[in-house]
């Protein structure tokens, strides 16, 4: 994760897996059933093959090197990036940030093919969605992907999280 550090990410993972509020876990405000569930789920997670790298400003080159090693040595079967726009393209100079994000996107596509594993890259949306009206207006579109038109071209699949209740639209 490029957005959260290891501790934050692990805390969120534990909260999600245990289905217990992160606030309750951090404050130790759990009832007996929740303590038992936390204990049981932590034992399961302890041996899970999950590797987190929170290197800030990770470049595509650094990611490729680390991913190759993890696939070779640990048998990693999925690579997740949180999130694409926090990466950089190996210190290369670009005319715009859009060109750089496009290069990053193409590099991730190449990495997925090279390693023969899926690469799931999260992306930020532009603010355009916030300015549109109504239920359909708030639904994210491919053109809302921030800083690149290449993401939609490079991706095998693009999924959006859309919560109408967030906008009080039912």
Predicted regions and their residues:
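Phosphate-binding/switch region of NTP-binding enzymes
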Residues: 99-170
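Cytosolic-facing regulatory segments adjacent to core modules
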Residues: 1-75, 89
